[in-house]
Amino acid sequence: WDIFRTLRDNGYITTGTSEQYFDPEALRFLPDRYVEGTCPHCGSDEARGDQCDNCGRQLDPTDLINPRSRITGSAPVMQPTTHYFLRLSAFQDRLLEWLESRQGWRKHVQNMAIGFTQEGLLDRAITRDLEWGIPLPPEANDLGEGKRIYVWFEAVIGYLSASKEWAQIQGTPEAWRDWWEDPDAETYYFVGKDNIVFHAVIWPCQLMGYEGLNLPTDVPANQFVTFKGDKASASRGVGRPIGWYTERLQPDAIRFAIASALPEQNDTDLSDEEIIRRVNDELVATWGNLVNRVLSMTARHFEGAVPPTQALADSDADLLASVDATLSETAELIAKVDLRAGLRRAMEGAQAVNFYLNAEEPWKSVKADRDRAGTVLATALGAIAGLAVAFAPYLPFSSSQVAAMLGLTRIEEWRRPILAPGTPLGPVVPLFVKLDDDVLDDQDGG
């Protein structure tokens, strides 16, 4: 209740009367999400009273065309009711200035937040006539019985309350301040585009009204993942839950397929065929096969240890330098929250190692020039060690496997590990399973 009380004490929460939809058959006021109708912006007839999933616009129940009760299907009627309101209008100028000053935000996020703010922020009720939800504390309740804090106001506060709870559990109750009050701390809110307004407009207003807490560093909202052209939605049964995939695919295979197709700027249709293609033709063929063939060749010809190296040729030094560049550039892309490009850059690094091997052909030179073959394989192992670091944020499970096969305890730093000659390698196991065409044919999944 700290934020509620502080906002009220600072004059940003006031009491007001509004009209709210009432279901005459159910004899109850309807929460925003219990009112459905046609979106006035895009025409979708499945819009809810708080937002339209189809176009992502935030709505009030009164905005809907031909509203209906989700409980009974009847046409609701308006009745007056008293609520607490958050004075969003008080933050209009300050918020707009802050939004326009953001550097590096995704354009669709910044444009939506600025556009919504420029339309004029309206004071918004933060309570509802409900039987469920967070009740108002008696000392803060001037409204009477039957009022609850509504979800849009309290949900985003969960970020702060979870931080405080974490600090308590750690036995350092003030540690949350390191993240919320230190001006050098950064916060990133990963959401879908239907949550942009809540995280880039409403939550910053709450933080501004509270005073002294860090505003979001970035709100890297994604566009929608679609299935057969329709937006994935658990509530509407479109798409498949992640558990369905984990029963059929390796976790890193799922992560790769999603990360390589992240809808960072546009909606992305993620079909079964596309998932299988990305896993087989990119993850398995490029990265998985590279790791397997280099470690298998080393185990076979150099007693399962990192080979000794002679003086590095230009091609060897160039490869290791390119891997170091891959690490640096991948880190920069991740820092910019350009995650799909970061993964693509890591894959380009793996392709460079494959090109190097095809040019050096250690499987041939091992018979005629064992020293040179050993140097090539040691160089390739070093490159793989560096790439495992670049892949780790995307493919944590298989990256740990690669580290173990290279004789490393774990990946600890964002740099290319140095593999000393003679370092014993772990057992060589395939990282990924090639997918059959029918692996995702289960009809129970969506």
Name each model feature, range by range.
Residues 139, 176-186, 305, 332-335, ...:
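Helix-loop segments that flank and shape redox-cofactor active sites
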Residues 42, 65-300, 344-346:
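Structured secondary-structure scaffolds
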Residues 4, 204, 291, 295, ...:
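Short, amphipathic alpha-helical segments that act as regulatory/interfacial helices
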Residues 31, 144-148, 194-195, 245-246, ...:
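Secondary-structure capping and boundary motifs in well-ordered enzyme cores
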Residues 267-272, 324-332:
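Short, charged/polar, low-complexity loop and linker segments
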Residues 1-121, 165-175, 291-330, 350, ...:
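Conserved, charged catalytic cores of large soluble enzymes
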Residues 183-187, 225-232, 281, 311-325, ...:
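Short, mixed-charge aromatic SLiMs
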Residues 16-21, 25-26, 37-56, 67-70, ...:
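Basic, alpha-helical terminal appendages of large translation-related enzymes
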